[in-house]
């Protein structure tokens, strides 16, 4: 089974935000992949100028079968440009990968499995 890449915002880099609950959910979601025997990598970025380059580098690390884009990037209206750029980066650097969207970090495995079918 091809590896999966999870792309999201680094909760510890969001000003005025308590990262603990999201970090716990990310860890729980990662454990679900491990328990399912699926190779998974995580790319968490800050909302800054380096985000796109970091994501592009992560996308080129392996031939990912699925890339899951987290809600932190996808949902806020003020991040729509970043979301569009992430989709373009996936298409450019991992054209073989299916694109999936989770509802929260714990559902990332479910999202990836929907696209693995």
Which positions does each model-derived feature cover?
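N-terminal, charge-rich interaction modules
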Residues: 1-15
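Short histidine/acidic/glycine/proline-rich micro-motifs that form metal-
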Residues: 11-13, 46, 72-76
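Glycine- and acidic-residue-enriched helix-capping/strand-helix junction motifs
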Residues: 13-25
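Short helix-loop-beta junction
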Residues: 28-39
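Short beta->alpha junction loops
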Residues: 41-50, 101-104
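Distinct, well-ordered alpha-helical segments
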Residues: 52-57, 112-115
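Mid-chain, well-packed structural core segment of small domains
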Residues: 55-91
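Ser/Thr/Gly-rich flexible loops in soluble cytosolic domains mediating phosphotransfer, phosphorylation
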Residues: 82-117
């Amino acid at each position: 089974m091809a590896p999966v890449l999870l792309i999201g915002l680094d909760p510890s880099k969001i000003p005025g935000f308590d990262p603990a609950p999201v970090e716990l959910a990310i860890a729980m979601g990662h454990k679900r992949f491990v328990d399912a025997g699926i190779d998974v990598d995580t790319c968490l970025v800050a909302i800054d100028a380096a985000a796109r380059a970091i994501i592009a580098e992560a996308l080129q690390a392996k031939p990912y079968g699925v890339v899951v884009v987290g809600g932190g990037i996808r949902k806020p209206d003020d991040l729509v440009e970043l979301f569009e750029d992430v989709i373009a980066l996936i298409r450019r650097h991992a054209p073989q990968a299916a694109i999936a969207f989770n509802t929260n970090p714990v559902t990332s495995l479910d999202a990836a499995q929907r696209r693995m079918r």
